[in-house]
Amino acid sequence: LMIGLLILNMVGVIDDLIRINYRRKFVAQIVASSFLPLSGLWINDLYGLLGITTLSPWIGMPLTVFVAVFIINAVNLIDGIDGLCSGLVGMGALVFGFLFIYNAAWLHAVFAFITAGVLCPFFYYNVFGKSKGRQRIFMGDTGSLTLGLSMAFLAISYAMNNPLIKPFSEGAIVVSFATLIVPLFDVVRVVRIRYFQHKPLFMPDQNHIHHKFLRVGMSHYVAMILILALALFFSFFNIVAVEYISNNIVIFIDIVLWIAFHLWLDRRELIR
């Protein structure tokens, strides 16, 4: 993990200073993510999701790299308004911290709480800092890329069926990604729009969820708070729901709720 974080931190610094081609950043993300399965951390069980349970290393390890890169990009792309990325990651890290404490995974809990703790002062100065007084700070790719890999590490650690990390839990695969539903679902929606509009998939646009909130007349601050509330809702809903219904049904409900929410936003935008 530390090697991967160092790689992405260096790439992020260079990109923030002189810009790097997205293809090179993508390669760096793959290399950094590869250290997770190489160190023995990989998704080895889907817990009945789509009818699939145990995964072989030949499938689970490449899947882990794909998922990690997916999370890194989702966190990077959601960094569009002040406090949103740090808020989502900080809140997600807190949830992971309590989940790992519940499962007596103390080292993972410490890492999760450290991640959340580091983001607290950043969130304050990013949202409430004064630009003229040089007290305001911004994340850039340096922060978003490393935070993305940190969240990928926490999510994959919770998803992995490994008694050395935590006891077996039937809903682990759903719970592990519950805190990341907003950025993950958002990047899927945005990439789909770009694909059908024949636009570059990795170039920025104005189709992210925070852009839609702004277009319906909300301020940056209100949009950020509502998106954080939405992410918190999905987190707790998934954690509770997996105790009563199957993983597949929970994911289906998540997708339906996400689509319904965007249909409501689209209608508000048209009315405005």
Predicted regions mapped to residue ranges:
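Hydrophobic core of alpha-helical transmembrane segments in multi-pass integral membrane proteins
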Residues: 9, 32-38, 119, 250-269
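Membrane-helix cytosolic exit motif
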Residues: 185-200, 258-272
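"…together with the soluble PPM/PP2C metallo-phosphatase catalytic core" -> "…together
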Residues: 1-187
